[in-house]
Amino acid sequence: MEIQQTHRKINRPLVSLALVGALVSITPQQSHAAFFTTVIIPAIVGGIATGTAVGTVSGLLGWGLKQAEEANKTPDKPDKVWRIQAGKGFNEFPNKEYDLYKSLLSSKIDGGWDWGNAATHYWIKGGQWNKLEVDMKDAVGTYKLSGLRNFTGGDLDVNMQKATLRLGQFNGNSFTSYKDSADRTTRVDFNAKNILIDNFLEINNRVGSGAGRKASSTVLTLQASEGITSSKNAEISLYDGATLNLASNSVKLNGNVWMGRLQYVGAYLAPSYSTINTSKVTGEVNFNHLTVGDHNAAQAGIIASNKTHIGTLDLWQSAGLNIIAPPEGGYKDKPNNTPSQSGAKNDKQESSQNNSNTQVINPPNSTQKTEVQPTQVIDGPFAGGKDTVVNIDRINTKADGTIKVGGFKASLTTNAAHLNIGKGGVNLSNQASGRTLLVENLTGNITVDGPLRVNNQVGGYALAGSSANFEFKAGVDTKNGTATFNNDISLGRFVNLKVDAHTANFKGIDTGNGGFNTLDFSGVTNKVNINKLITASTNVAVKNFNINELIVKTNGVSVGEYTHFSEDIGSQSRINTVRLETGTRSIFSGGVKFKSGEKLVIDEFYYSPWNYFDARNIKNVEITRKFASSTPENPWGTSKLMFNNLTLGQNAVMDYSQFSNLTIQGDFINNQGTINYLVRGGKVATLNVGNAAAMMFNNDIDSATGFYKPLIKINSAQDLIKNTEHVLLKAKIIGYGNVSTGTNGISNVNLEEQFKERLALYNNNNRMDTCVVRNTDDIKACGMAIGNQSMVNNPDNYKYLIGKAWKNIGISKTANGSKISVYYLGNSTPTENGGNTTNLPTNTTNNARFASYALIKNAPFAHSATPNLVAINQHDFGTIESVFELANRSKDIDTLYANSGAQGRDLLQTLLIDSHDAGYARTMIDATSANEITKQLNTATTTLNNIASLEHKTSSLQTLSLSNAMILNSRLVNLSRRHTNNIDSFAKRLQALKDQRFASLESAAEVLYQFAPKYEKPTNVWANAIGGASLNNGGNASLYGTSAGVDAYLNGQVEAIVGGFGSYGYSSFNNQANSLNSGANNTNFGVYSRIFANQHEFDFEAQGALGSDQSSLNFKSALLRDLNQSYNYLAYSAATRASYGYDFAFFRNALVLKPSVGVSYNHLGSTNFKSNSTNKVALSNGSSSQHLFNASANVEARYYYGDTSYFYMNAGVLQEFANFGSSNAVSLNTFKVNATRNPLNTHARVMMGGELKLAKEVFLNLGVVYLHNLISNIGHFASNLGMRYSF
């Protein structure tokens, strides 16, 4: 029975033929961002004419399953709907395989021969205007659909949610359509548990040869609750007008997916459009191989999930792939603000208004029928979510020999947060007229891990007029994308690279394989970072850049082929190293030139013959480290180095000769750099400055000779032509300035004289113009410099020069406002009374004469008597003061003594000089301010004094001993009980005393207490957990452990308590700066007793303690790092105590007040330190021993309640009245730390505690104690929690 169904609207595919027209205007040479902004994104985000919000969750689902309707198109209506339901049996055999077509579909699908296309095709029974719905939702098993080729419509909807669908097991399937006046769309939907594609699958193909009827559009929807998989041999082909919707947990397509495939001759004359929608795939979508285009300008779109992976992407030379990632948070629901309103309003004076606020008003009595179309909501482009990723292992383009003016462009466009191209890189197939590949991420980043190839060759080349072009654009819309290339890029001749981004990062770029390349980075708005750039005749369009190394080759073609930086480079551009490689000869020279810029900083510049550097259009160029020839030993060619304004930075070095061929058309500033003039043929080349020159110097001295650091050095000056003026520098105006004194000016005679002292002539490494003689070795060196063999062979004959500076009057110097020059007459010879000498200043010791090892870089002169000679300190060389003085920081010596004292000074001497040398000391103080030095020294001396202190070393033993003193006092209080509430015990004692006579006159209670045993079970075993801490300004120490003992009450001729104990505690210490950390294992053991004589109590105690300490020093600063080490030592103590007290009893002995006095002896000590450090400042020695004699006074209150419970408090003062001992100073190389101790200490102590009965014969006790040193302000705190068992 045929089932009729009310006509309803059927959505059409996103990329339908109507949309094709909108896309035709997009030529391959245009940016494919238009595909997003004008077609794809409005269609997805805004919905199309039906009013369906396709960019929303519900709208996208509707589009994914039924597709969006073509704009303003009357909906298709099926003439007839057939329905088939899988009946009994299909839901019973989950392992059975069925032929889907034979089992269910064949009864409602007809087939026949298409004479126009010479092929068989299939359609829904009754014609392509009908629909077949198959209800298999309860069916199980596997259903094969194989050989359903050329299915031309109408619609097919198969619901088999619990079953597996296998497409193409033995033969492929194709779902297509026939084009007619209605442009009818074929829609095929499969909903299964799993979908397996085993053979070819075609969508919207032409039937047969394709010469007959065209296809309209086809939508194939595959839904699988678990997964969709295709085999390696299963090729999926999407023809023009095809849409494939995939909805599943995961999609893995192992075979080739071909979008925009051709089927008939001539199809390449028009572009094709196809779409794959994977937005409803929750996991990763994996395309093993994706091909876009088939000799045609195919345009393909993938509506992507969060993560898309493509193994190999093949793009035809004019094809475009657009991968659209979902926005942050996915597609959201939009309110349905569009009514489905299509009827006409004919009521008099009635109006209708839709939700788009458009009001239609019908005039009175009008018979006109007005149809209100749905509102179309169109949103703009959006960025992919922050976790959206498109990964492509390799991109290939394919090309043929077609020639087109401007060439062809293939494109890949996405909006994902990250577009990653893997190790396979990018291959561009190039042909005549040129080919271009555009890779753009509209809103995110691009990363390329592999190489760029042309015709499968790294460094592949193209021909003139047929260039190969790579284009990468990151963050086109956001202007905040980063393009990163993690592999070296090698570009052959006529191969170009264009990158647009906010920031571009390159590992390396090599265009030196023949040149004629363009690197267009003008679209990078922030910074271009290149590790290594090799160029030859390359056009480099870049604004602000940071190039680690620039190597400029000559291309070997003709004169004038430069690497051209064709954009304004701005003011932030920098090149760490420039290397101009040697050209062949003048006709094959090359070079680099710049269009314009504010400033270029170059750290190192190495020039070579026949390679030019033209920076005349850059306002300022600064050389910060080195300016030299890369071929100084073989200067057979000439260079041409051209600048506008050039600055030689501080401590930079310029090697200059006639081969440099340096042109400065503006100003030259030598800002405390050094110019080395090389003598060639007896001459030096003149450095000509077009405008003004500034020679800025300082008061630093040369590290090797002790002279002022030269600003100009003439090497091999002995080869200069004699009796000739040698002009070193000429300018319209020359100014001089001393930055150390802050003076500068033009025509300043004093500054000119100072500058001349910084113009030095050398014979090898020996100064010619002045000799400083401190010993006979200096006499020999002077003789070698001036060519005086007598001074070399017989230095003793010239001892009169020792302690003097001798000036070579055969050399004269000129430094004025227009030139700097030297005039060489020949070397003069020193004589004993010939003058031309200046006495060197001295100090109180002869050590001042031997300064060579202390003359470290940047050390300025400190004595005005010889401003051109070596500095002589007021302090002995080899002292830390001399290093400060040479560093022109004499005031810091006073700061050091004022803030750190002699101990801090001695420690600095030990750390920097005694353990290293003056050179190391100079390096360290140059890097550290005076305030920081004193701060670090104070930290170190405080820590070292703490280490040496015997109080610190025995602190944990004292805390452990204090814990035990509290426990022992608690035991004595417990056993000294006179009060009982136990009536049974009292009655038993009375019975035992029956018929006894006593001589005493005390009360009955006193008699009972005196002659009664303290307990029925007088022997006790006890154990306590203990914890303690030592608190002071230098740090915090903590201790935890356990203590145990046994005691008993003895009732013989003498009434007494005797006991013994042992304890263990682990202690740790950290000072406030965390530079000292310690851990120690400690033991304590001893005996105690109390003797009773009526209300008199005599206490005696003896104990010993031993601790093994492991400590480490951990200073963070570089200045103190040599102190860092681990070390160990032993600490020990021994003590005896005796005291007397008298009990005052109240409330029938329940409350007892006991004052007491006592004396004690303590012996404290430690062994030498043993360090694991191999540095010269390893800790050693440090043993200490101290004997202490103390007197104490205490008051104790006890309260007894019940039969066993009690509480007590004890407070008192302990005063040392004598001490003596010895200590071995802690040694760190030459630095000593002597232990210091307060003469006589006073301690205050308070402790309290008590005991509760838990069960018969089992008791719980606890207590706390605090001891405070009133002199050193150190506190010790301890507590215990313990158990006692009585037996």
Swiss-Prot record:
Region Disordered, residue ranges: 326-381
Chain ranges of the Autotransporter domain: 1014-1287
UniProt keyword Protease present: no
UniProt keyword annotation of Oxidoreductase present: no
Keywords (A to Z) from UniProt: Cell outer membrane, Membrane, Periplasm, Secreted, Signal, Toxin, Transmembrane, Transmembrane beta strand, Virulence
Gene Ontology molecular function, alphabetical: toxin activity
Signal peptide: 1-33
Cellular component terms per the entry's GO annotation: cell outer membrane; cell surface; extracellular region; periplasmic space
Classification via SUPFAM superfamilies: Autotransporter
Its job: Induces vacuolation of eukaryotic cells. Causes ulceration and gastric lesions.
Domain description: The signal peptide, cleaved at the inner membrane, guides the autotransporter protein to the periplasmic space. Then, insertion of the C-terminal translocator domain in the outer membrane forms a hydrophilic pore for the translocation of the passenger domain to the bacterial cell surface, with subsequent cleavage.
Protein name from the UniProt record: Vacuolating cytotoxin autotransporter
Gene responsible for this protein: vacA
